[in-house]
């Protein structure tokens, strides 16, 4: 039978079960129909209000959401709703109404209709802070032509291949220093290995990496004694993400008017982020003015932006602030999840290591060449982001009316792609709970079509994508060459939503060095 309110297109390919007749798998696993091979309706599209929904009372919906799931489990809330309503549903939480989709065919229709200046959901407390305190904004919060102008200029220095090749030595140096940190700890432990939670170390690694790429300078975050001011910046980023969650579905002005601790902590976090980013940028600018601009070596993204007249200094500062704020927790979390999956899947880890060692030998140590010889390693990053995406959804406001699943979705509607639910859906991924990077190497496009969404899609995909991909790949190359990574407990650590998806509890790794001589140095 059909799920309530679902059009004929929602029937699975002949011989398969319908959406709701499928058994739940694991923690709320579900089976949804694919667009391919499904029946296509020839009738007029159904109206928007017929899309399956829990009801139009946003505040009542929000109450049930808080009581039954909670904001920190919103990713599981999506999974449960797709199980209940089918592959498309609409939900109003508070005063925000969205249409949610999961099928890659629908995702393709959505992104292919996004227009030249796509708009996504803007985090309400971020907007409130920037507006109330009159902070400059970059591409993260800009719209339309203003966004386009900044994005085009930034793409040339952040996304273009001729620019990103300059990042390799900067990122490799930081990764090698991280390896040295672990070797020092193994030596200090005196047990031939090191065990512990390295999440704070990964935050510092990510901060050291992004600042080296932006400023062309090291901040000393991997030294024995850590710069306390830089650590304040890292802590502020975490606090900014964490305090955003309670204000996603309630007006941030309420938190501000009642002077809640959540709002005060959120403001304090942003104040630190802006203050530190401004100091970094201003110091770099004045040093450049004093020493001149004659340099043969690459000096980082900021140097290139300042040498170009396409952006004002205020716009440059705003965008540098956003890149710094967005380049720490996001990358470090993905690396932590990747180490976690490698430690739980030692055969996969051995395959990745064999590929890296062969690439090192063939490339004779040249990192640029090595990066072309590790397709499985790159696929493993995609696989990590499938199981553990940073964002719980991707969002677009429709530019024009769009028909999805035979429903007419009006222009300006917020449509969200539930990428956590998509990544763990057995209809779209065979054996979805299994960490299998080889699935991304398939030549069958139907297996990967609009499924690799960890960095978003299109012209508004993650600005730092190329930096993050290089940073993570180079980090993993160095780690695989130097250590075998194991985990003390193989059970699932769980996932929690703190604006980004994070491990629910600390992960303790054990690192076994291959080169004992390096450990003794």
UniProtKB/Swiss-Prot annotation:
State the membrane topology. Peripheral membrane protein
Q: Which Gene3D superfamilies match?
A: Cytochrome P450 (1.10.630.10)
| PROSITE patterns per record | CYTOCHROME_P450 (PS00086)
Mutation effect (residue 189 to V): In AICSR; no loss of activity
Q: Which UniProt keywords apply?
A: Cholesterol metabolism, Disease variant, Heme, Iron, Lipid biosynthesis, Lipid metabolism, Membrane, Metal-binding, Mitochondrion, Mitochondrion inner membrane, Monooxygenase, Oxidoreductase, Steroid biosynthesis, Steroid metabolism, Steroidogenesis, Sterol metabolism, Transit peptide
Which EC class is this protein assigned?
oxidoreductase
A Pfam family this chain is assigned to: p450
Q: Does the keyword Transit peptide apply?
A: yes
Q: Where is the transit peptide?
A: 1-39
**UniProt GO BP:** C21-steroid hormone biosynthetic process; cellular response to peptide hormone stimulus; cholesterol metabolic process; cortisol metabolic process; glucocorticoid biosynthetic process; sterol metabolic process; vitamin D metabolic process
Q: What do the Gene Ontology cellular component annotations say?
A: mitochondrial inner membrane; mitochondrial matrix; mitochondrion
Q: Please describe the quaternary structure of this protein.
A: Interacts with FDX1/adrenodoxin.
Q: Which family does it belong to?
A: Belongs to the cytochrome P450 family.
Give a short account of what the protein does: A cytochrome P450 monooxygenase that catalyzes the side-chain hydroxylation and cleavage of cholesterol to pregnenolone, the precursor of most steroid hormones. Catalyzes three sequential oxidation reactions of cholesterol, namely the hydroxylation at C22 followed with the hydroxylation at C20 to yield 20R,22R-hydroxycholesterol that is further cleaved between C20 and C22 to yield the C21-steroid pregnenolone and 4-methylpentanal. Mechanistically, uses molecular oxygen inserting one oxygen atom into a substrate and reducing the second into a water molecule.
- Which disorder is recorded? Adrenal insufficiency, congenital, with 46,XY sex reversal: A rare disorder that can present as acute adrenal insufficiency in infancy or childhood. ACTH and plasma renin activity are elevated and adrenal steroids are inappropriately low or absent; the 46,XY patients have female external genitalia, sometimes with clitoromegaly. The phenotypic spectrum ranges from prematurity, complete underandrogenization, and severe early-onset adrenal failure to term birth with clitoromegaly and later-onset adrenal failure.
Q: What is this protein called?
A: Cholesterol side-chain cleavage enzyme, mitochondrial
Q: Species name for this entry?
A: Homo sapiens (Human)
What broad taxonomic lineage does this protein's source fall under? Eukaryota, Metazoa, Chordata, Craniata, Vertebrata
């Amino acid at each position: 039978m059909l799920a309530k309110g679902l059009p004929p297109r929602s029937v699975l390919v002949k011989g398969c079960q319908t959406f709701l007749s499928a058994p739940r798998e694991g923690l709320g696993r579900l089976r949804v129909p694919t667009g391919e091979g499904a029946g296509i309706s020839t009738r007029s599209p159904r109206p928007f209000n017929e899309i399956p929904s829990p009801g139009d009372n946003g505040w009542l919906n929000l109450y049930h959401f808080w009581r039954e799931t909670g904001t920190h489990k919103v990713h599981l809330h999506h999974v449960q709703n797709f199980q209940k309503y089918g592959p498309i549903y609409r939900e109003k939480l508070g005063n925000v109404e969205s249409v949610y989709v999961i099928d890659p065919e629908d995702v393709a229709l959505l992104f292919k209709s996004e227009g030249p200046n796509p708009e996504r959901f803007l985090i309400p407390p971020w907007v409130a802070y920037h507006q109330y305190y009159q902070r400059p904004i970059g591409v993260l919060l800009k719209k339309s032509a203003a966004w386009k102008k900044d994005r085009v200029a930034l793409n040339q220095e952040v996304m273009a291949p001729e620019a990103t090749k300059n990042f390799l030595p900067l990122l490799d140096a930081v990764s090698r220093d991280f390896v040295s940190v672990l070797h020092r700890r193994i030596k200090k432990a005196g047990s031939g290995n090191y065990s512990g939670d390295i999440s704070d170390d990964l935050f510092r690694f990510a901060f050291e990496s992004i600042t080296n790429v932006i400023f062309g300078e090291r901040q000393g975050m991997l030294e024995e004694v850590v710069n306390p001011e830089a650590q304040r910046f890292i802590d502020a980023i975490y606090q900014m993400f964490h305090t955003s969650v309670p204000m996603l579905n309630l007006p941030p002005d309420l938190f501000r008017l009642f002077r809640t601790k959540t709002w005060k902590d959120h403001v304090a976090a942003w104040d630190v982020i802006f203050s530190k980013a401004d100091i970094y940028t201003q110091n770099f600018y004045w040093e450049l003015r004093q020493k001149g601009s004659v340099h043969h070596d690459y000096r980082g993204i900021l140097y290139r932006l300042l040498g170009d007249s396409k952006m004002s200094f205020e716009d440059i500062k705003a965008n540098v602030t956003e890149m710094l704020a967005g380049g720490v927790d996001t990358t470090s979390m993905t690396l932590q999840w990747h180490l976690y999956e490698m430690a739980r899947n030692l055969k996969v880890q051995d395959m990745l290591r064999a590929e890296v060692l062969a690439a090192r030998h063939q490339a004779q140590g040249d990192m640029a060449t090595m990066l072309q010889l590790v397709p499985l390693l790159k696929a493993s990053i995609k696989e990590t982001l499938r199981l553990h995406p940073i964002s719980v959804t991707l969002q677009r406001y429709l530019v024009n009316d769009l028909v999805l699943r035979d429903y007419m979705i009006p222009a300006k509607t917020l449509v969200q792609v539930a990428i956590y639910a998509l990544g763990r859906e057995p209809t779209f991924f065979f054996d979805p709970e299994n960490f299998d990077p080889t699935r991304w190497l398939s030549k069958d496009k139907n297996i990967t079509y609009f499924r690799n969404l960890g960095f978003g899609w299109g012209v508004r995909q993650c600005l730092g994508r190329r930096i993050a991909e290089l940073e993570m790949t180079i980090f993993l190359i160095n780690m695989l060459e130097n250590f075998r990574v194991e985990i003390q407990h193989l059970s699932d650590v769980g996932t929690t939503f703190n604006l980004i998806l994070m491990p629910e509890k600390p992960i303790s790794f054990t690192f076994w060095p291959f080169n004992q001589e390096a450990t003794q140095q």
